[in-house]
């Protein structure tokens, strides 16, 4: 089942995050992920969460692939680069739906 990982964050250390992004590209692909959108905050006219500087939307082939990526022991030294590179990290997982019927029940 296709999943979307919504990542919202502020960049704290550009070098650390750049290292994470560079090294994460191949493993993300290996586990069925693909960055499908990135954005830089333009404005925040409405909402309950504090605005974040960066949006990254990753499409995954499955929830299992997400957790394989996150828990791969060979990537143990990779994730700290993300943690050191960002602040105020929000990570939400969404199941793909074709229309709103599943949430309007």
Predicted segments with their positions:
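A common structural junction motif
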Residues: 29-30, 74-80, 86
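Short S/T/G/P-rich N-terminal loop/turn motif that feeds into the first structured element of a domain
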Residues: 1-73, 92-105
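Intrinsic disorder/low-complexity signature
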Residues: 4, 84-85
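A short, amphipathic edge element
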Residues: 87-91
């Amino acid at each position: 089942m296709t999943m979307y990982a919504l990542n919202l964050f502020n960049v704290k250390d550009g070098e650390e995050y750049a290292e994470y992004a560079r090294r994460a590209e191949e493993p993300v692909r290996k586990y069925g992920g693909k960055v499908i959108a990135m954005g830089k905050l333009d404005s925040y006219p409405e909402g309950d969460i504090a605005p974040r500087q960066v949006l990254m939307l990753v499409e995954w082939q499955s929830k299992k692939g997400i957790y394989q990526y996150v828990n791969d022991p060979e990537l143990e030294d990779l994730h700290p680069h993300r943690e050191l590179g960002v602040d105020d990290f929000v990570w939400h997982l969404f199941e793909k739906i074709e229309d709103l019927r599943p949430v309007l029940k």
